[in-house]
């Protein structure tokens, strides 16, 4: 196996990242894990809960996944004792307080064409999550949309929304968040070349 020091094979890193995302965003109770309102969980409790499910995760591997995750999904506390998902929570326990931020003129949302009729009628809604997630660039939005089917990119007139009283937040990993995006602020972009 040709992996660099402190690097996991891609399938292992992906599996661990997905497990952490599920537990820290959506279902901490499945392993008896307690999250505080800002989403922090004790690392030792997380590792013990995962072990009770018959899976092995040690601190060094956890730290490697956090440090090398391409989407920077996780944050470790300064003292190294706690971990949290940066954004994307659906569990009602977590009510992160992000500072309000001035958005760029345009933001982007990647989705699948099968969702367009609903989006045209209702705009973007957070669904089970606490916020609508927006990307600062087209490339990231395209990658997100591809995960759900035939992708389409929606351009968000973020500055106009902001001027009309909508609040934006930006998570530590650069993902922009807002409560909803009414359809009047959305524009479908031309389909990317395949």
Swiss-Prot record:
Tagged with keyword NAD: yes
Q: Which GO terms describe its molecular function?
A: NAD+ poly-ADP-ribosyltransferase activity; tRNA 2'-phosphotransferase activity
Annotated coiled-coil positions are: none
> Where does this protein come from, organism-wise?
Burkholderia lata (strain ATCC 17760 / DSM 23089 / LMG 22485 / NCIMB 9086 / R18194 / 383)
Top EC class per UniProt? transferase
Family per similarity comment: Belongs to the KptA/TPT1 family.
Q: Which InterPro entries match?
A: Ptrans_KptA/Tpt1 (IPR002745), RNA_2'-PTrans_C (IPR042081), RNA_2'-PTrans_KptA (IPR022928), RNA_2'-PTrans_N (IPR042080)
Instruction: Tell me what this protein is called.
Output: Probable RNA 2'-phosphotransferase
Q: Which GO terms describe its biological process?
A: tRNA splicing, via endonucleolytic cleavage and ligation
